[in-house]
């Protein structure tokens, strides 16, 4: 697969410079109790596609798949950056599990500077190290349960979940922020094969931690045979880039279409029982940073006839004046 020119993530925000992203303003205005939308690309009409892991939208858990060269790693990086642009670290945080050490965790740190939303990384560690990491995650769940119980007693609320707690924090009623916690696990198929107990416990953590703001996103190159009923029942959304065969696609989006994708970064997103299904092209976070006060947009006035997998069948130039 050859990478075609893709939309840079800054283009998605009409930003020629980092400052033009208006990140602080976004952090102040975006309400994580109502939505966790993050742009991930554009559809075949050039309209934005967003992933919203809010409980009442596409969330809380999901699957991402893509074979080598599909753009899966870039897609995950773009999604993480999109969340970071739109939500304060007090509202959204992340733990990255990069079992093969593919560089996902390192993409968000340069020297002593790192993305403030990343609260932990787990990479290239043995069984004992994985167990310690699991204990830390379980300890965080217990801490959240204690804080939620304290908030319930303070407010006489019948129940407290992550959305109610964050509203109490935003309103100044509770003092300690508790962000949504995304556990993003890349190459989970290999982790499941080599450390099955850890993987089972991680899925259990996600199930128990649902009301506590824990989200589990599992990514792999080869989903066929490793997406079992437990994983499938806990995954509300599936995103599939180019995969090797039809069964890989079926295991993620319940249809074989992603095996026929052609372009790097092209993907299908499927939510629930086909509540939402779309073909998209992801934004690209790997472009070199060239600051500009002028946002250059190339307007394509041609008409393209495409197949159901996004391949251009015919292109007609607009010659009308």
Regions found by a protein language model. Name each.
Residues 306-309:
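Long intrinsically disordered, low-complexity regions that are acidic and Ser/Thr-rich
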Residues 163-168:
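Disordered, acidic interdomain junction associated with two-component signaling
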Residues 255-275:
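Conserved C-terminal "switch" segment of AAA+ ATPases
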Residues 10-15, 320:
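Short glycine-rich, low-complexity/disordered patches
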Residues 2-12:
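Conserved small/polar residues in nucleotide/adenosyl-binding loops
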Residues 3-4, 18-159, 171-251, 259-260, ...:
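P-loop NTPase catalytic phosphate-binding loop
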